[in-house]
């Protein structure tokens, strides 16, 4: 199904075109088009609608889940001094999950028709159109699917009474991640920390796309040696 020398027509729905690029997909998807208006994905208005998510849907949908999870642990006998470090641990675990997901799933290399198509839907579209404000945060359905492995991890490493709080902390970490991600693309930070985060992330998009996988911090890039060269620690003379 891969067409030799295929050229994508940006005026037509893209999803079922990109698979035809074959091995050329990797180069094509990492040549960003930095316009605010995103492309059309599907001919069908219904399927097109499902690909669009406003940023504020993330806190509106998932913060109540965070509150409910923490309240469950409280109702099962956990005190506030016990819950706070558990929630913080959940946030910390999310940062690792964020890194692994971004590096090994979102940046997997593909060349088959369906591999390219799936990758474009999952993350390739964001690299091709990084300023598309309606396809930047996770759609609620995708987040719900990711909840299952994270919930199983929470249950496996904690007790029945603390698992909801740990999961809630992870979900809070996710909300912070997605809102931060949107902010880095569409806001103009004035504080040094957020200015550096924006520079760090846009460096991943426009300069060194196989480094700098952390969104909310560069911690795991430092740990696993994927810090961009401009951020790497200087060697002593």
Curated annotation (Swiss-Prot):
Check the record and name the Pfam families matching this protein: FA_hydroxylase
Annotated compartments: Endoplasmic reticulum membrane
Q: Does the keyword Lipid metabolism apply?
A: yes
GO biological process, alphabetically ordered: fatty acid biosynthetic process; very long-chain fatty acid metabolic process
Q: Which molecular function terms from Gene Ontology are attached?
A: dihydroceramide fatty acyl 2-hydroxylase activity; iron ion binding
- Lipid bilayer topology: Multi-pass membrane protein
Q: According to its UniProt record, where is this protein mainly located?
A: endoplasmic reticulum
Cofactor(s) needed, names only, are: Zn(2+)
Membrane spanning stretches: 50-70, 80-100, 137-157, 164-184
Q: Which domain of life is it from?
A: Eukaryota
Q: Which residues bind Zn(2+) 2?
A: 126, 181, 185, 201, 205
Query: Under which EC number(s) is this enzyme classified?
Result: 1.14.18.7
Gene Ontology cellular-component terms for this entry are: endoplasmic reticulum membrane
Give expression by tissue: Expressed in leaves, roots, flowers and seeds.
Cofactor stoichiometry and binding remark = Binds 2 Zn(2+) ions per subunit that likely form a catalytic dimetal center.
Q: For this UniProt record, give its keywords in alphabetical order, as a comma-separated list.
A: Endoplasmic reticulum, Fatty acid biosynthesis, Fatty acid metabolism, Lipid biosynthesis, Lipid metabolism, Membrane, Metal-binding, Oxidoreductase, Transmembrane, Transmembrane helix, Zinc
Q: Which family does it belong to?
A: Belongs to the sterol desaturase family.
Q: How does it assemble?
A: Interacts with CYTB5-A, CYTB5-B, CYTB5-C and CYTB5-D. Interacts indirectly with BI-1 via CYTB5-D.
The protein depicted here goes by the name: Dihydroceramide fatty acyl 2-hydroxylase FAH1
Q: Please report the organism this UniProt entry assigns to the protein.
A: Arabidopsis thaliana (Mouse-ear cress)
